[in-house]
From Swiss-Prot:
SUPFAM superfamilies: Phosphoenolpyruvate/pyruvate domain
Listed Gene3D superfamilies: 1.10.10.850, Phosphoenolpyruvate-binding domains (3.20.20.60)
Protein name (database record): Isocitrate lyase
Active site: C215
InterPro entries for this protein: Isocitrate_lyase, Isocitrate_lyase_ph_CS, Pyrv/PenolPyrv_kinase-like_dom, Pyrv_kinase-like_dom_sf
EC class of the enzyme, as a word: lyase
UniProt keyword Metal-binding, yes or no: yes
Taxonomic placement: Eukaryota, Fungi, Dikarya, Ascomycota, Pezizomycotina
Lyase in keyword set: yes
UniProt gene name: ICL1
PROSITE patterns found in the cross-reference section: ISOCITRATE_LYASE
Catalysis: reaction(s): D-threo-isocitrate = glyoxylate + succinate; (2S,3R)-3-hydroxybutane-1,2,3-tricarboxylate = pyruvate + succinate
Membrane spanning stretches: none
């Protein structure tokens, strides 16, 4: 008979219920911590525990998540920032650890350099969904290894000498790109599970539609309704709770530059949906279907669409109401606009139409179906206001919020921060210091130097250059390959080895950096202290660098 224990419990329902209630109380105690003071969970501790198995597993992700939260709490409270960049591989993560307190793993970089299918491509999230978790695991295993290696090295030195040795924190928390979640809610949960198992401290997820996902700095972005993205955030938190992890969830919105919306089902989106205000036009898709039936294609179809859009006078309903008031003979136009705005704010389009009808005495023509795309998407009035509207809705379900933007626009970043903090004053913000921006034309160098600090004062406590790993690798690779092709080994000496030695970069002794000494010590431990095949024994060429 199997033993009666936690991993193979008694079939006695009383014992089963007792174990269940103890675990439920433990979860409730966990959730009462100040860490969760801003977090809304639309599920119960009982529901979470009932989804767990009997074998408790302590994930390293939880330790790293607690560490990340502590970093961001401190930075936010002091209006400071943790800033980092996208890491490509283990060499890079060990060098970043010396100077930066977090690490970023980019979906864009993974798509181009580390797809699980080995097929590179642009940032469309069309790679296997194991891709970014695998890169997290790759880097986290390297972090663990170099942490072990350093500890062994330090403990091999007399105590009185250790104070002069570097003691690098290699275990910098990793934040990774979850794209749109790669599918429905169960896909989001499985992806979250993978990230936790691989060692991620936090993940971010964006409010684009999965089938049309684009890099944040590409055109053609389609947003999902607000509630659909909230459901994704809830799915992340639920999966992390099931696994007992404090994993941070960062909500990204692409609303600033998005032009399309998958559906108008959520009334919180209604104020930003564009409609035709020209009652004489047929619906756009009817025209496009008729044109295709006559053999038109390509540029001809684009011309038909462009001409229709020019005539449609696309507008949000609120702007259409304002235009109708301006065109009318009302004595107090400003007062009517103000009353409409105060009464219609946050209302559905149906309710806003009723307010407008009451104030203007008539219905306003506004058709948001007429301009829909051939895929069925609604036209959207994106921008900072749209992003703030979404961020406020996401705030109770995430740990930080990021608005993707077209430019490094400080005034816009300030507007977004003020909009969010007017409702959620403690909400942490994240910012993409993107290499897609032309920093030279965006601002002078002295402003570039202070940009991170200025953003931090607004509450952007975590900032990152998504693709700096890619670009720095490309730059040195181009420089070295070009020089090597003309001056041979002089290029390696001048561009690589001598600067490594001058700047005391540990990788100059690449055998030691790779852990050869550590592995020798493992081997000696097993063989009683003697090994004739030690990698770092007499004859190792690295002695030239003493």
């Amino acid at each position: 008979m199997a033993s009666q224990n936690m991993t193979n419990p008694s079939i006695n329902p009383d014992i089963e219920d007792e174990l269940f209630q103890k675990e439920v109380e433990a979860v409730k105690t966990w959730w009462s911590d100040s860490r969760w003071r801003q977090t809304k969970r639309p599920f119960t501790a009982e529901q979470i525990v009932s989804k767990r198995g009997y074998l408790p597993i302590d994930y390293a992700s939880n330790t790293q998540a607690k560490k990340l939260w502590k970093i961001l709490e401190h930075r936010f409270e002091n209006r400071d920032a943790s800033y980092t960049y996208g890491c490509l591989e283990p060499t890079m993560v060990t060098q970043m650890a010396k100077y930066l307190d977090t690490v970023y793993v980019s979906g864009w970089q993974s798509s181009s350099t580390a797809s699980a299918s080995d097929e590179p491509g642009p940032d469309l999230a069309d790679y296997p969904y194991t891709t970014v978790p695998n890169k997290v695991g790759h880097l986290f295993m390297a972090q663990l290894f170099h942490d072990r290696k350093q500890r062994q090295e330090r403990l091999s030195v007399p105590k009185e000498q250790r104070a002069n040795l570097l003691n690098i924190d290699y275990l910098r928390p990793i934040v990774a790109d979850a794209d749109t979640g790669h599918g429905g809610l169960t896909a989001v949960m499985k992806l979250t599970k993978l990230f936790i198992e691989k060692g991620a401290a936090g993940i971010h997820i964006e409010d684009q539609a999965p089938g049309t996902k684009k890099c944040g700095h590409m055109a053609g972005k389609v947003l999902v309704p607000i509630q659909e993205h909230i459901n994704r955030l809830v799915a992340i938190r639920a999966q992390a709770d099931i696994m007992g992890s404090d994993l941070l969830a960062i909500a990204r919105t692409d609303a600033e530059a998005a032009t399309l919306l998958s559906t108008n089902i959520d009334p919180r989106d209604h104020a930003f949906i564009l409609g035709s205000t020209n009652s004489t036009l047929k619906p756009l898709n009817d025209l496009m279907i008729a044109a295709e039936a006559t053999g038109k294609s390509g540029a001809e179809l684009q011309r038909i669409e462009d001409e229709w859009l020019a005539k449609a006078n696309l507008s949000s309903f609120d702007d259409a109401v304002a235009a109708a008031i301006d065109a009318g003979s009302f004595s107090d136009k400003a007062g009517i606009k103000q009353e409409y705005t105060s009464r219609a704010k946050g209302k559905s389009n149906f309710e806003a139409r009723a307010v407008a009808r009451q104030l203007l005495g008539r219905d306003i023509f506004f058709d948001w179906d007429a301009p829909r795309t051939r895929e069925g998407y609604f036209r959207l009035k994106g921008g900072c206001d749209c992003a703030v509207n979404r961020a406020i809705a996401y705030a109770p379900y995430c740990d930080a919020i990021w608005m993707e933007s077209k430019l490094p626009d400080f005034a816009q970043a300030e507007q977004f921060a003020q909009g969010v903090h007017a409702v959620w004053p403690e909400k942490k913000l994240a910012y993409n210091l993107s290499p897609s921006f032309n920093w030279k034309t965006a601002m002078p160098r002295d402003e570039q130097e202070t940009y991170i600090r200025r953003l931090a004062k607004l509450g952007y406590c975590w900032q990152f250059i998504t693709l700096a790993g890619l670009h720095t690798t490309a730059l040195i690779s181009d420089q070295f390959a070009k020089a090597y092709s003309t001056v041979g080994m002089r290029a390696y000496g001048e561009l690589v080895q001598e600067p490594e030695m001058d700047q005391k970069v540990d990788v100059v002794k690449h055998q030691k950096w790779s852990g050869a000494t550590y592995v020798d010590e493992l081997q000696k431990m097993v063989t009683g202290g003697i090994s004739s095949t030690a990698a770092m024994g007499a004859g190792v060429t690295e002695d030239q660098f003493k």
